[in-house]
A protein has these predicted regions:
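A short, N-terminal "cap"/entry segment at the start of jelly-roll beta-barrel domains
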Residues: 1-42, 49, 122-144
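Short histidine-centered beta-strand/loop micro-motifs
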Residues: 30, 42, 49-54, 71, ...
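Short strand-connecting beta-turns/loops that link adjacent beta-strands
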Residues: 35-36, 74, 100-102
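Surface-exposed, flexible loop/turn segments at secondary-structure boundaries
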Residues: 49, 67, 75, 93, ...
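Short acidic-glycine-tyrosine-enriched beta hairpin
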Residues: 73-89
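Ligand-binding loop in jelly-roll beta-barrel domains
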Residues: 89-119
Length: 144
């Protein structure tokens, strides 16, 4: 990742690089990765069971597709492209893709940076042994 004080990204180009299929729940591409915050683009391939993050707050913008988003004890809420959800650390949440819809792609910011192992499933059996994330090959920031 380029350590400049600023970067420009072509999100459409990054989205086009996501594979059609993946064994992991998501495939992501880091846009920034600093102690104070990290930002990523990720595509959802399989349901993400209810889980939490102990070390970071999360800010998610759904760029494409539709998902059913479960949070805390509320019934799942349908999110559509252009909608955003934010929540603090230790809030249980899960994401279910909508069958037959466009692939769900999110822009996310974690504050502070989420440690790689900070994904704690409420019921580990629900993950069915599926890996949480696969990283897209490093994306080089390009200045405009």
């Amino acid at each position: 990742m380029d350590e400049k004080a600023y970067n420009f990204f072509d999100l459409a180009e990054i989205k086009a690089r996501f594979p059609d299929r993946a064994e992991s729940m998501i495939v992501d591409a880091y846009l920034s990765d600093h102690e104070s915050a990290s930002s990523r683009l990720f595509r959802l391939y399989h349901p993400i069971p209810r889980h939490l993050h102990e070390t970071c707050d999360e800010h998610l913008v759904l760029l494409d597709g539709e998902v059913d988003f479960a949070i805390a004890d509320e019934p799942p809420r349908r999110l559509r492209a252009g909608q955003m959800v934010t929540f603090l650390r230790n809030i249980v949440h899960g994401i279910q893709p909508v069958e037959g819809g466009a692939p769900a792609v999110f822009f996310t910011v974690d504050t502070p940076r989420r440690a790689p192992g900070d994904v704690h499933f409420v019921d580990s059996a629900e993950s069915k042994g599926r890996r949480f994330v696969t990283h897209l090959a490093s994306y080089e920031a390009r200045s405009a």
